């Protein structure tokens, strides 16, 4: 079905709005120049996590650190293969982490609301916007325990900390034990640096530190937001425990390891889904009779979602041409629309 749709699309005349006028001296040459080789190639989905490893992580289901290591080993292999949609994977996990953080802070903002917020005009303000920025910064930059980075995250949570002193403590923790245990200790250090009255905000800071230290220890080029996506899972809590473990609690190391075991499995599932979707997008891209199409493909592979207006800013095309291009991709099953609205639509893998 997709091949037939592609052949049909290839026979359609190009949309005049999709064209970018070329200088007179280059127009004739442009007609005869060979097509460029696609920048991205299709990529096999990562190996699925075994059923025995997927069952781990829950309270009372064996050693959570063992299951965390198994999941991280597979996720590490998947990331080191450098899949085309690695950016979209990190961006989507950052969105999930922001939504989970909003629940911890009792902020009314789910994934859909956060997606809309990310495309709001101007500089969005408020707790939800700050949470989204914290996790996007975490996933979008090389992992670092630089005091300035720590201070910026703390400021967005309205926390008064000593960034230099905290950075020194975190670096000391980061070199200890195995990667997951080191990240758990660093999270405890970050959490303990804040007065008890701001425990919820301190936990968000601690979770971002956890993922940063984990990335440093695993030598990932960018952190992959993991722990917040599963920390609220009720199966991590032992029966009769009363409340969810927080950094510094005796049950925290096991809860953190269990959350990572579950998060790594879910991240691998998401990576496999994005690999299949990105392969469809990459296969469709050469058939699109639009010069800026490759830039749109790049945006979709690097982000959770893209608006036509944003696409038009990054590619030499009008907003109407961008909407038409996304409609074509949607028709061919190469992208999805996330908002469900007739206007102000958002597209992604």
What does each model-found stretch correspond to?
Residues 282, 286-290, 337-349:
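Short, cationic-aromatic polyanion-contact patches
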Residues 296-297, 302-314:
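Short acidic, hydrophobic short linear motifs in intrinsically disordered regions
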Residues 305, 331-334:
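Short hinge/loop at the helix->beta-strand junction immediately C-terminal to the helix-turn-helix recognition helix
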